[in-house]
A protein has these predicted regions:
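Short, intrinsically disordered low-complexity segments
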Residues: 1-2, 25, 53, 506
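Ser/Thr-rich, Pro/Gly/Ala-heavy low-complexity intrinsically disordered linkers and tails
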Residues: 20-80
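Beta-strand/loop edge motif enriched in small/polar residues
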Residues: 21-26, 76-527
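Sec-dependent bacterial lipoprotein signal peptides
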Residues: 1-18
Length: 527
């Protein structure tokens, strides 16, 4: 996360839109289950299509053929998404908020018979549901800061399938990171800030979130891909690929890829949301970022860094921006992660596999951190106390059953850890300043009971290949006697898969979940 400055200069440039139209007609298309009776505005014509049951709000206005209904299941379709040209419809809210923003006040469905152009910033009103069918492509209109914002009490139901994914991408002819915004989901789960507003948007009542409903339900995002987002609204102020603000534990998030974003792939501002099978490809900031009291469960995460000279970390973690003791303290549970870094030339900005700072807690298991400038940095005094389990009352920081290898280190020599690093633990781990050396990450990770692996090469050189990556270690490292199994920890029962007792995001050398299916895309650098 790049910290924010200068909101006031960008208010007039924002435009977010949720809706479905390029005209202002009153016609509504309704899809109805056989045997059901729809509630329809006067003058509308229902279209019967066995399989869905709508509820249409009185007076709803939907343009360009969007379907208004409840978030029921999508109609069954072909095994894969059809190819060919589709008509284009504009997706924009039915209530204009000014400054390029709109609000969708009724439930609405985006169907796969069209491509959808997202025109500006669109807020989904509390009580309304945005349903996006499998095989839908939503293209952010360049120059409008196109972003979907699901407000607390609203829902998004974007449930794709492995071979029939939902794609959110740039509408530009030549696509680049930052062409459009992204997806922001705001909920009513606990955060440690008072009436916070979400990063990337101007401060307003429209962008507040958080509450006391730990099991809040903001819907589902499954088998979906987000590309070329992270629009820059001002200096150090970009929207993440997917942002979660106070999202609750009943929300379903899995099999989501963010690629080529100008900011973080995934950021969690407080909340209790659980997510699994997340892929972050070539971000220009961090892979997975949390703060403001996030306490969810994350499992099966993959990061592939790109060729950018910036402070891009695998994990970047804070309790808040200044490391206060505000409660709840950030304390996620994380397991089964493969972080594939990209060591840059000497003098480039530092990149850490894990940057844990500003009083965060964390329970981290079964991670491979490979190929960063530094494997891990536990930074600042309060965070050191949590790592040493001496921060009164907890929570603490624990990193165990994890493998760290192939770092540039302090000397800038691309030394492979731990060559030379017992004499100088800074190589491959923390920075060289006196403050950072007050905590020795090498010694901390080396405690026998932690079961970390600090001297074995997982041979993941192909994990950096942008078009045909291989994130799997050799077969010998798996199996009953392989280090990635014998040193692994049993995942916490709160995680989606407590049977995943192996280090890294993949069960064995043949497990290819992050490179299989139409929901993920791998292309040469810059494409």
């Amino acid at each position: 996360m790049r910290k924010l400055i200068g909101f006031g200069t960008i208010l007039g440039t924002l435009a977010f839109a949720i809706g479905c139209s390029d005209d202002n007609g009153k016609s509504v298309t309704v899809t109805v289950d056989a045997g059901t009776t729809p509630v329809v505005d006067a003058g509308t014509t229902p279209v019967v299509d066995a399989g869905t049951t709508p509820t249409v709000d009185a007076g709803a206005t939907v343009d360009s053929g969007a379907t208004v209904d409840d978030a029921g299941p999508a109609d069954s379709g072909p095994a894969t998404c059809p190819t060919g040209t589709k008509p284009v419809a504009t997706f924009k809210g039915d209530a204009d908020l000014g400054n390029g923003q709109s609000e969708q006040t009724t439930s609405i469905r985006l169907t796969a018979d069209k491509d959808w152009e997202l025109d500006g910033v669109v807020f989904i009103k509390p009580g309304a549901t945005l349903t996006v069918d499998p095989c839908v492509t939503v293209k952010g209109k360049v120059g409008t800061a196109a972003t979907i914002v699901v407000k607390p009490g609203a829902k998004i139901m974007a449930k794709g399938e492995a071979e029939r994914p939902i794609v959110f991408t740039s509408g530009a002819g030549t696509r680049r990171p930052g062409d459009w915004g992204g997806l922001i989901i705001l909920g009513r789960a606990p955060v440690n800030q008072s009436a916070p507003t979400i990063e990337g948007l101007p401060v307003s009542a429209e962008t507040t979130f958080g509450g006391t409903i730990a099991d809040d339900d903001s819907g589902a995002v499954e088998y979906a891909r987000f590309e070329y987002g992270g629009v820059k609204l001002g200096a150090n102020n970009e929207i993440n690929g997917v942002t979660f603000g106070g999202v609750g534990s009943r929300t379903s998030i899995h099999h989501v890829q963010v690629r080529h974003t100008l900011d973080d792939c995934f950021e969690f501002f407080g909340g209790t949301v659980n997510a699994h099978h997340l892929v972050c490809t070539s971000p220009q900031d961090d892979g997975f970022d949390w703060d403001w009291g996030f306490s969810g469960n994350l499992q099966h995460l993959v990061l592939q860094q790109g060729l950018f000279d910036d402070e891009m970390n695998g994990f970047e973690a804070d309790n808040d921006a200044t490391g206060t003791d505000l409660s709840p303290i950030s304390n996620p549970t994380i397991s089964n992660v493969t972080l594939c870094g990209r060591i840059m030339v000497p003098g480039a900005k530092k990149k850490f596999g894990m940057l844990l700072r500003r009083n965060t807690g964390a329970n981290i298991r079964n991670v491979i951190a490979y190929g960063f400038d530094y494997g891990i940095d536990i930074r600042d005094a309060k965070t050191h106390l949590r790592a040493n389990s001496t921060q009164g009352g907890g929570p603490n920081i624990s990193v165990a059953s994890s493998l760290f290898f192939n770092f540039k280190g302090a000397a800038g020599t691309n030394a492979t850890f731990p060559t030379g690093s017992q004499a100088n633990p800074a190589i491959g781990f923390n920075e060289t300043s006196t403050t950072e050396q007050a905590f020795n990450e090498f010694t901390w990770l080396s405690v026998a009971s932690a079961n970390n692996i600090l001297d074995q090469d997982p041979q993941l050189t192909a994990c950096k290949d942008p078009s045909t990556p291989n994130f799997n270690a050799p077969s010998a490292m798996y199996g009953a006697t392989g280090l990635l199994v014998t040193k692994a920890a049993t995942p916490a029962s709160s995680l989606p898969d407590s049977t995943a007792k192996y280090i890294g995001a993949f069960r064995d050398a043949s497990d290819k979940w992050a490179t299989t299916g139409a929901w993920v895309k791998w292309t040469p650098e810059g494409q």
